[in-house]
A protein has these predicted regions:
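Catalytic cores of nucleotide-sugar-dependent glycosyltransferases that transfer UDP/GDP/TDP-activated
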Residues: 1-229
Length: 229
C-alpha cells in the first residue's frame, strides 16, 4: 500500500518528517498548456510501514488553506490543482515502476484521476491490469470549480463526450465523472444525495453500500477480493 496526497500548505513538514525525493522530482506537468514543476516529498507511517507520497508545487499547494480562502470562497485554480494532482500521482507511480493492483480514489481533488487513467494513460503497460475504485462521500463543496475545467481536460486529448458532466463542474458532476471511469464504487457516506445514489446504482458498476466503522475494514477487503482481484 502506498498513499498519495497533495502537499497542502497546512501540513507541518518538520513534525511529519517530510523530505523531498530528488529522483522522483524535477519533471514538469502540463496543465492547460503551461509547464508546472512537480515536487515529490515523502513521509512514512512507521507502525503501519506505509509510505506517504506528497504531490507538491509551490503555485498550487504552498498556500496555508486547503480548498477555500478566508472568506470560504473556493480557490479559482482548484480545477488545475486537481488536474496537476491526477497527473502527478500517475507520473510518480511510473517513476517508482510500481504496479498497483488497485488505485483507490478518495475525495474530489482526486476525482479526475480515473478519467486520466482511462484516456491519457490508457497505453501505459504498467497499468494494464490495474483496477480503479472511487469512494463517494457526501457533498464536499458548494458552487462550481472553474467553468473552463472541461476545456482544460480536453486539452489533454480526452474526448469531450467522455467528460460532458464537467460542463457544469460542481461537486456532484465531478464525482460522476470519477464513477463513470472507475471499475467499482464504494459508498463512503450515509449522506449522499438521492441523485448521486441513483447515478451510482444506474452506472452498473460493482458497488459496495455504506458500511459502518466497525464493519468497513472487512467489507472493503471482501469487496476487493470478490469484485476486483
Amino acid at each position: 500500500i502506498r498513499i498519495f496526497m497533495p502537499r497542502y500548505g497546512n501540513i507541518n513538514e518538520r513534525r511529519h518528517q517530510l523530505h523531498e525525493v530528488i529522483r522522483l522530482s524535477g519533471m514538469n506537468l502540463v496543465v492547460n498548456d503551461v509547464d508546472m514543476p512537480l515536487i515529490i516529498k515523502v513521509a512514512s507511517i512507521p507502525r503501519e510501514r506505509i509510505q506517504v507520497y506528497f504531490i507538491d508545487n509551490d503555485e498550487y499547494f504552498k498556500r496555508k488553506a486547503t480548498f477555500t480562502d478566508e472568506e470560504g470562497v473556493l480557490f479559482p485554480d482548484n480545477d488545475e490543482r486537481a488536474i496537476f494532482f491526477a497527473k502527478g500521482v500517475v507520473e510518480t507511480v511510473k517513476k517508482l515502476n510500481w504496479v498497483p493492483d488497485i488505485i483507490h480514489v478518495h475525495g474530489w481533488m482526486a476525482a479526475l484521476l480515473p478519467v486520466y487513467m482511462k484516456y491519457f494513460y490508457k497505453d501505459e503497460a504498467l497499468f494494464a491490469n490495474t483496477k480503479i475504485v472511487t469512494s463517494v462521500y457526501g457533498q464536499s463543496f458548494d458552487g462550481n470549480l472553474d467553468m473552463e475545467l472541461m476545456n482544460k481536460v480536453s486539452f489533454d486529448g480526452i474526448p469531450a463526450e467522455a467528460i460532458k458532466d464537467l460542463e457544469t463542474p460542481n461537486y456532484e458532476n465531478i464525482i460522476k465523472a470519477s464513477v463513470l471511469h472507475s471499475d467499482a464504487v464504494i459508498v463512503a457516506s450515509e449522506a449522499l444525495s438521492p441523485s448521486l445514489t441513483k447515478f451510482i446504482e444506474s452506472s452498473k458498476k460493482p458497488f459496495l453500500p455504506f458500511a459502518s466503522k466497525d464493519k468497513f475494514a472487512e467489507a472493503y477487503t471482501d469487496f476487493y477480493k470478490k469484485m476486483l482481484l
